[in-house]
Amino acid sequence: MCPSEMGTLWYLWSPVLISLAALFSKVTEGRGILESIQRFSLLPTYLPVTYHINNADVSFFLKEANQDIMRNSSLQSRVESFLIYKSRRLPVLNASYGPFSLEQVVPQDLMLPSNPFGFTNTFSLNWRLKAYILQEKVYLSHPKVQVLFHIVGRDWDDHRDENLPCLRVFAFRETQEVRGSCRLGGALGLCVAQLEMLPGWFSPPSVVSGRRRPTEQPEGSPVELYYAVQPGDERGDCAKEDSRKSGGAPAGHNDVDESSPPLHRIGSVFLRETPSSPPLRELRLDSNVAVHYIPKTVRQGDVLTFPISVSRNCTEDRFTLRAKVKKGVSIVGVRASTSSLWDVKQSTEYTGKYAPAVIICQKKSAGSGKSVDDASYEVMKIDIEVEAPSDPPTTQLVTWQVEYPGEITSDLGVSKIYVSQKDLIGVIPLAMEAEILNTAILTGKTVAVPVKVISVEEDGTVQGLSDSVECRSSDEDVVKVSDRCDYVFVNGKEMKGKVNVVVTVTYQHLSSPLEMTVWVPRLPLQIEVSDMELNQIKGWRVPVVSNKRPARDSEEEDDDEKRGRGCTLQYQHAMVRVLTQFVAEAPDPGGHLAHLLGSDWQVDITELITDFMQVEEPRIAKLQGGQILTGQELGMTTIQILSPLSDAILAEKTITVLDEKVTITDLGVQLVTGLSLSLQLSPGSNRAIFATAVAQELLQRPKQEAAISCWVQFSDGSVTPLDIYDEKDFSLMATSLDEKVVSILQDPKFKWPIIAAENEGQGALVKVEMLISESCQKSKRKSVLAVGTASIKVKFGQNDANPNGSESGHLGAGLHVENINDRRSKKPFQEWGSPEGPYYSSSSMGLMEGWGSTTKRPTFPKKEGQENLLDDIILSQTMATDLTSFPDQVDLPGSNVGTEEHDPDQAAKGLSDLEIGMYALLGVFCLAILVFLINCVTFALKYRHKQVPFEEQEGLSHSHDWVGLSNRTELLGNHMNFASSQEEQITAIDRGLDFEESKLLLSSNSQNSINGQLFRSTGAMLTDDKEQKSEPPTSPTSKRKRVTFSTFSAISSDDGCPSGNTMVLSNEDDIKWVCQALDPGECPEPHSCMERLHEHV
C-alpha cells in the first residue's frame, strides 16, 4: 500500500486501536487486582465488623488453614469461626460496626450436635456422662452389680433445681436381660444403679445342639452392661420397671422399646459361682523374711491372719521375729506351718495384753518347702484380733522386725489394719472437668480443676472423703495434684500435654485412677502480621507526635511538601494476631499427636498474651493494644512474645520498615444500612461455628441513613481497613452526584459522613474522598489521597421486614430464609435449615433511625471460581429482588448505564466483566473491519484515475505530515500509557480526568470539546511528573496500568478548517494542528482539502 494510504489508514485507525487497547486493559484489570491482593497480602477483604462473645467462660476465635480468602473476599460481609470451649449458660455473639449492633444467642444444638441431655431444661455444654463399674467380679453368694454414674463438666457450685435425667442400666447374657435404674442428682450430679444377676447366669453357658461347647474363661462368664438416658416423670422420678429377681422370668432383647433412647456400652463384668482366694499383699522385711496379708476393711471382733514366709535361698538357721501392736488390736495366736522344717516358739519375755510378740524360729533340717517351684515357703501364721473401733475410724498399725544372731536387725516393716463399721467396695475420684486447657504457659495464671473423692458402700451409699486420702500424679510435667487431693492443676511450668494422664487416689486399701486430658499450646506460637514490610505513604502527612521525630526530607518532595512543618509522612499500619494449636500426646508411646480441634484449625490467643507482647526496637515500630502495628522509622526489628514465668521467648516475628514510599491506589467503599447475623455449624469440625455478618444495603424510607465502610489498597499490593488508622490523621468527605436521590450529612457524633435517602433512584451516586488531616493541609491545594465511589439503590415503600423485596420461602436446597429487619422494639432471631445442619440468623436496622444503602458488587473484584460461604445466601437474596421495581438508572455525566427491564432474570444476574469486555471487543473488531472496507472502497474509487507521476510524488508531503508535526515516537512513548494503576482508575487528581468512574460498570468518559479539540481539566496540572517517573517500568513494584476511554468529536471550526477526529493525549502545546499548503478558510471538508492539495502539486 502506498505511503499516502498508510497515513490515511493510521489517521482513521488510531482511535480504534487506542480504544481496543483500553478495552483489553479494562477487561484484564479486575483479575489483576485480586491476584495482587492474594499475592502480597495475608489479609482478605471483609466488612470490618467487630465480634464479641459474651456469657462464655472460655471461648476462642479460630482460623482454618487456607480458608480466609475463600470465605472473606467481599466488602459486604465477614465470616468468622469461633469455639465455645467452656460456658455455664447460653453464650451470646455480638456483632457491631459503627452505630449498628446486634446480638445472637448461640443455640445449644450448634455447640452440642449429639447431646444426651438435650431434653433437659438446663444448659448442658461440656457435660459428659461417665460410668464406673464398682465390682468387676461378681459371685453367686453376692450377685449384685453396682454402677456409679457421674456428670463431668457440671458446675458443682450451681445448686439450681435441675431436671436431671434418669439412667436405665441393662445387663445382657445370651437372650436374657436384667435392668436397673437411678436418677442423677445432688451437687455432684451422680447416682448408683444396682442390678441383681439371675442365679442361672452363674452356671456355665448352655450348649446349643450342633454347636461347639464354649470354653470356660478363667475369670468367669462375661456379662455386657449398657445404659440409656431417659427423662423422668412429672415429679422427676424414674418410671417404674420390671425388676428381675432370682427365679423371675427372663426377658429378651425384643422387650426393649425401640422408640427409647439408644443404648451406650458401659463394659463387662464376670460371674463366678465360688469366690477365689483373694490375692495377698507382701511386706518384705529383708531378703529372707516376708509378711503377707489380705487388704480389706475389718470390723470389731474380726481376726486377721498374717502368714510369714521364708525365702528358699535363706542361709540363716535361726532368726527372731518381733511384732508390736498398739491399743485396739492384740496378738491372739502363733501357729507353725511347717513344723518339720522349723521350730517355732513364742517367747514369754514380755507379758501383757498389748505386749509385743517375740517369736523365735529355729531350723530343724536342711530340707525345703513343699513346692520346689515357689521362691519362698510359709513358716508360720500369726493371728491378730481387732477390738472395739474408735470413732472416727482409724488405721491400726502392726510393726514387724527380724533379728539375727549377732544383733543383726532388719528395717522396720509396717502393716496397716483398716478398721471400720462400713463395708466399702470402692473409692472414686471425681473431677469437675474432664480436660484442662493449659493457658498458664501463656498467662502465668494457674488453671485448676476441683476434685472430690467419694466412697461407695455395699448398699450403694455414697459419702465424701476428705481425710486420709493420698494421691499422686503419674507425670508432673503434665499435671500436678494438691496435697489434700482437692484439685488438680497446671501452673505453667509443665513441658507437655497428654491424653488420659493418670492421677492415682488411695484411701485405706482401695485405690482408683483419675484420668484427665491436658492440652498445651504448641510452641513456638505463630505471629501473623498482615503486612511485614511497612512503608511511608506518599502524600499522607500527619501531625508529628511529641516523642516522634519527623521523617527525613526526601529528594522527591517539592517545596510545598517541605513547607508542611509539624507534619510527617504516615507509615503503613498492619494488623497482628497470635495463633496456636492446643495439642496433647497420645496415651501410648509412639502414638499420633492429638489436636483440640484438628490439625487444620488454629486458635486465636491474642487477647491472652497481649500483656507479654513487645517490639524489640520501639523506635522502629510501635504495637498498639497488641493488635495494630505502626511503623516509626527506617529499620528492622522483631515482635516478641515473652514467657510470663521465665526469660524464654515464646514467639518472634521479623518486621521491616522500609525507606521506599507507597501510594494509595484504591479506596473501596461499602455503604451499610444495617447488619444481619447468621450462625452455622462448620462442615470441617463439629465444634467450630461460623458467624456471618452481612451489610444490609437497600434504602427503603425517606431520610433513611447509611454508614460508610472503607478499605485502602496500596501500590505494594497490601490492603487494609481504614478503621485501623487513627481518625485524627485523615478525614472522609462524601459528595452526592445527584442530590435529588441522596444527600450527605456530616454529623459530628460520627467520624465519617452519613448518606441519607431523598428520592428513588440508583447508580454510582456517592463520591468519597480521603483527605489528610486539616492541620497538615497545604495552602495551595487540597490534599486528596484517594477517591472512591459507591453505588446506591433507593426504593421506597418496600416492606421493612423483607428488604430484598421477596416473601419468605425456600431459596435453594433446604435453605429457609426469614428476614427480620426492625430491631427497634424486639431482638428476634430465626432458624435457617440447610443440608449441613441448622442455620440461625438475625438482622438489625441499627441504633439509628433508618440506615441504608446498597452496593451491588464488592469494590475489590473476586477471583474467578472463588468459593465463598455467603454465595448461596447473597445469590438467593439477589435473585429474590425484582430489579424492575426500581426506578430507572440515574444518568451520570459521561456514563451510559442501564438495565434490561424486559428480562428481570438477566438483569438480576448481570454480566461479568469478562463477558462485557468480550462483547465490546467483538463490536470493536466488527467496527474496525467495516471502517477498513469502507476506506479501501472509497480510496479505490476516488484515486484510481488520479495517479501522480513518480517525480511529483517525491515532493508531495504525506497526509500524516500535516495531521501531526510532532515526533510520533515521542508522542506514543510519553502519552499513550494504556496501563495505569488502580489508584489512577478512581483518583481524579492523579490523572486529571474530570469525571467519576463506576467500579462496577464500564462507562465512557465525559470530556470537554473546544473547537474540536479535547483539553485536560485543570486537575491534570496537579499531577507531579516526578511521581510518575519515580519507578522504572521494569520495577517489581510498578503498578498495573489502565486505559481511559475517550470520545472524539468531529465539529468543524468556525474558520472552516477541518478538525477531523482529532485526539489530544497531552497538553495542547505538544501537537500543532496545521494545514500549511492551504489557507484556513479554503477547506470546507477534508475531501475537498485533499483535492486542492493535489491540484497545487
Curated annotation (Swiss-Prot):
It comes from the Eukaryota. Residues 935-1097 are cytoplasmic. Keywords: Membrane, Signal, Transmembrane, Transmembrane helix. The keyword Chaperone does not apply. The keyword Membrane applies. Residues 31-913 are extracellular. It is a single-pass type I membrane protein. Residues 1-30 form the signal peptide. GO terms for cellular component: membrane. The chain crosses the membrane at residues 914-934. InterPro entries: Ig_TMEM132_2nd, Ig_TMEM132_5th, Ig_TMEM132_6th, TMEM132, TMEM132_3rd, TMEM132_C, TMEM132_M, TMEM132_N. It is found in: Membrane. Residues 233-245 have a biased composition (Basic and acidic residues). Expressed in mature oligodendrocytes in the brain. Residues 233-263, 885-906, 1021-1042 are annotated as: Disordered. Regulates neuronal morphology via inhibition of the WAVE regulatory complex (WCR), a complex that controls F-actin cytoskeletal dynamics. Belongs to the TMEM132 family. This is Transmembrane protein 132D. It comes from Rattus norvegicus. The gene is Tmem132d.
